[in-house]
A protein has these predicted regions:
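Predominant activation on well-ordered alpha-helical scaffold segments within soluble catalytic domains
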Residues: 18, 136-143, 191-195, 242, ...
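Short, solvent-exposed beta-strand edge segments and adjacent coil->beta transition regions
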Residues: 122-125, 180, 221-225, 281
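Short Gly/Pro-enriched turn/cap motifs at secondary-structure boundaries
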Residues: 183-186, 214-217, 259-263
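C-terminal substrate-binding/catalytic lobe of Rossmann-fold NAD(P)-dependent dehydrogenases
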Residues: 187-253
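C-terminal active-site/capping subdomain that shapes the small-molecule cofactor and substrate pocket
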Residues: 227-320
């Protein structure tokens, strides 16, 4: 059994991670650390887990095989400075602290559809961001093709859980319900990793992306619509996408338009491509807390420990 510790275990991504791991056939949850809830029942914070006999506790880093860091951005690096982790313990970080090459050190970027083999041999993995996952999976086949578009316009809408557990004016029900709002236009923090990953596939790729993120009024799920011009015909583009994701169990090409409820509460990414004249539309949908965070973290753990990539991730979509 894989002995697991989670640091920062009280937030949304940690809650989803716990929910997935308690049903994982090869996992034993050893330590759930939360400085603000030390000694409390996990069910007092994650209210659907009141049936579990789990408590928040301090970590014993010598008694685990893998450490998940579910901490705020900037806090994972600080945690690792204060708490040296034994060399025998693998680390999966869900913050943005180690995603960019300038800060990565020996952390491997944890997008299995791109880095599956590197993840298999990794001891430290940086889990991608939620918007980054959806956009990269929507555009990666283009970057790999050698003929990427000169410019891509991306419109993305995300659920309220993408903002985290701490309430703010923008996440308050009276503001978010029955409302849409743009934010961080052309400057979202995930753009840096998106550009770096897409450009890394070909030295000629410029990764010119204009990204407009939108706060949705739903709880969870991301939809990305990417538009670009291409001289290729639709069948060629779809074939390119199918070839890129062949053998990757969680990224699925759809001939029909996709929608959020197909993937909410799952680790899947569904991708659909349409074309009219030279205009191409790529739509990708994911659950921001699963394929965009905790589910992908478990997928990476499975690869790191030589397990079936899908272990513990046979999750049911809500659908309706």
């Amino acid at each position: 059994m894989i002995r697991v510790g989670i640091a920062g275990a009280a937030g949304y991504t940690a809650g989803e991670l716990i929910r997935v791991l308690i049903s994982h056939p090869q996992v034993e949850l050893r330590y759930l650390q939360s400085e603000s809830h030390r000694g409390e029942s996990v069910g007092r914070v994650h209210r659907d887990l009141i049936y579990m006999n789990l408590k928040f506790s301090d970590l014993d880093l010598t008694d685990i095989d893998v450490l998940f860091l579910c901490m705020g951005h900037g806090m994972s690096a600080q945690f690792l400075e204060r708490h040296p982790v034994p060399a025998s313990v693998r680390i999966i970080d869900l913050s943005h602290d180690f995603r960019l090459k300038s800060n990565a050190g020996d952390f491997v970027y944890g997008l299995p559809e791109l880095n599956r083999e590197r993840i298999r041999g990794a001891w430290h993995v940086a889990n991608p961001g939620c918007f980054a996952t959806a956009i990269e999976l929507g555009l990666l086949p283009l970057a790999k093709s050698g003929l990427p578009p000169a410019h891509v316009s991306v419109f993305g809408i995300t659920g309220a859980t993408g903002a985290g557990q701490k309430p703010t004016e923008e996440t308050h029900y009276s503001h978010r319900a029955q409302n849409l709002s743009v934010y961080k236009v052309f400057s979202h923090q995930h753009l840096a990793e998106i550009r770096e990953i897409l450009a890394g596939q070909d030295e000629d790729v410029q990764a010119d992306i204009a990204f407009v993120p939108v706060r949705g009024c739903h709880a969870r799920g991301i939809m990305i619509n990417a538009v670009f011009a291409s001289e290729r015909d639709l069948s060629e583009i779809r074939s390119m996408y199918a070839a890129c994701y062949e053998g990757h169990p969680f990224t699925v090409m759809s001939d029909e338009p996709v929608y959020l409820k197909q993937v909410v509460n799952t680790n899947y990414c569904f991708v659909h491509v349409e074309q009219q004249d030279r205009n191409v539309l790529v739509t990708s949908v994911i659950d921001n807390l699963l394929k965009g965070a905790s589910g992908q973290a478990v997928q990476n753990m499975n690869l790191m420990f030589g397990l079936e990539e899908t272990a513990g991730l046979g999750l049911k979509a809500s659908y309706f």
